[in-house]
Amino acid sequence: MNRDNMDTTKRKEDHTKHTTDVIEFYEEGTAASSLNIATEKANSSPSILRRIINRAAWLSKKVDAMGVESTGIQRISPYERGTSKKQFLHVAGLWLSATGGLSSMSSFLLGPLLFGLSFRESVASSLISVTIGCLIAAYCSIMGPQSGCRQMVTARYLFGWWFVKLVALASIIGVMGWSVVNSVVGGEMLAAISNDKVPLWVGIVIVTVCSFLVAIFGIKQVIKVETYLSVPVLTAFLLLYISSSDKYSFVNAYVSKGNLDSSTRKGNWMSFFSLCYSITATWGSITADYYILFPEDTPYIQIFCLTFFGTFLPTCFVGILGLLLASVAMSYKPWSVEYDSHGMGGLLWAGFQRWNGFGKFCVVVLVFSLVSNNIINTYSAAFSIQLSSVFCAKIPRWFWSIVCTIICLVCALIGRNHFSTILGNFLPMIGYWISMYFILLFEENLVFRRFFLHLYTKEFPTVTGEINGPELVGSSKEVEKDAVTNIHLLKRKHKVTKHRYNWDKWEDYEVLTHGYAATFAFIVGVAGVVVGMAQAYWIGPIAAKFGEYGGDVAMWLSMAFSGVVYPPCRYLELRKFGR
């Protein structure tokens, strides 16, 4: 009986092997046939198309060989991240270089020069608003280590697969707007120290191209370069404090524009407040990008404090200097002439002028602060473009960095003679959308991911049986009870932390939220922008109540409108769709 069973088993195995051989033979034949058909189509296609494809393939291989970062918007898994404490030092250097530069100082100049505020009024307005902006940027940064995703990729958990594209577009406009401003300022500086021997457009090209050459390589190179640049740049700013100190007696000579009534002065104070808030708050759209290599169990408080102090201290350091220079220019005629002739670059050269040749060298060093800021903008903007469609995501990040550089260069060349107008009217608008994004993220984390996690049935499906890995995270109720932990951290022998996001589903359309609640709240927030903004092209009815030029309160109204609408809409969305 046993022998019969063995014979039967052998016949079944022979039959199975025969069937497998037939299937493999069929698949090989089909693959060969498909390859022949594809080859015939390629051979029959126009020769120009073949040359383009071959050239693109050759270029990609060359770029990869140069060590350019190939990772796009893909999540960095816990296994691929570092554990060295040097990462904290490098990121601290990154923030010192990126935020302690002329791009931050440029907005502070407008307190006295554009809004007619005294030095004391400008200091009070700017320091309070910058602090609030840094708090928002720091809060957004905590999404980086826990997710391993770029900032705008994490926004998919708020806005869903489709609507996040609108947020990504706003992020692109924001960071590229700063790049345009930086390029123009760099051109003005080079023109000022060369007595116009270096035309403004040439300086713009130099700053833009230098930024691109670093940004194309990837996050590791970006962080290293930013760290190295922070030392000479901050040293140059310290020297500018010293060099310009002989004119500080003119600071108090200018009080404020005497032709402004009390209401208009308050409105200008509020508009300058919103402008300075935008300087640091807009970092919230990309801060998480630079923490994706940190261990997944990095304490939130460490990331928050590193980002807050890393952006607050350098911004205030250069901002106060900018207010001093601008206040002197309002009372001291030679500096005023330099500003009228060469913009911010002329004002910086005036501060260094008594040091002659060494002063020119210091101005050139300060140009690197603009390059530092543009490097980050160009690097992060590419990821937002990849979020716009599946097709764009398949195109390497370095290609989109080239596109961003070209766009920045063209816009800077076109708007180079209208710097103050661009800066005063454009930058506050960047702060509008980040205010709405922040309040939605804050409420999602504080309310729904903490108290209503059981409603996320798509993201945390109920699991019966043993949990075997990252694909099975467990039910949301188990997560709330701390019954389910992060399997990755157990394997890496780090401190166990609990999930409140299923980050493994970052690109799963069937799991990610539809984004109806966040998008509707965002649209309602736009209504707050319309009634509260005070710009040259539009003054809202609420903003118009503050003087002749209005007072910009759009950021706070948009945040309030979105914050009130989102909770009930999000609750209904979770109850209806489970995601």
Swiss-Prot record:
GO terms for molecular function: transmembrane transporter activity; vitamin transmembrane transporter activity. GO terms for cellular component: fungal-type vacuole; plasma membrane. Residues 120-122, 179-198, 243-274, 324-362, 416-421, 541-545 are extracellular. Gene3D superfamilies: Hydantoin permease. The chain crosses the membrane at residues 99-119, 123-143, 158-178, 199-219, 222-242, 275-295, 303-323, 363-383, 395-415, 422-442, 520-540, 546-566. It is a multi-pass membrane protein. Disulfide bonds: none annotated. Thiamine-regulated, high affinity import carrier of pyridoxine, pyridoxal and pyridoxamine. PANTHER family: PURINE-CYTOSINE PERMEASE FCY2-RELATED (PTHR31806), VITAMIN B6 TRANSPORTER TPN1 (PTHR31806:SF17). Belongs to the purine-cytosine permease (2.A.39) family. This is Vitamin B6 transporter TPN1. It comes from Saccharomyces cerevisiae (strain ATCC 204508 / S288c).
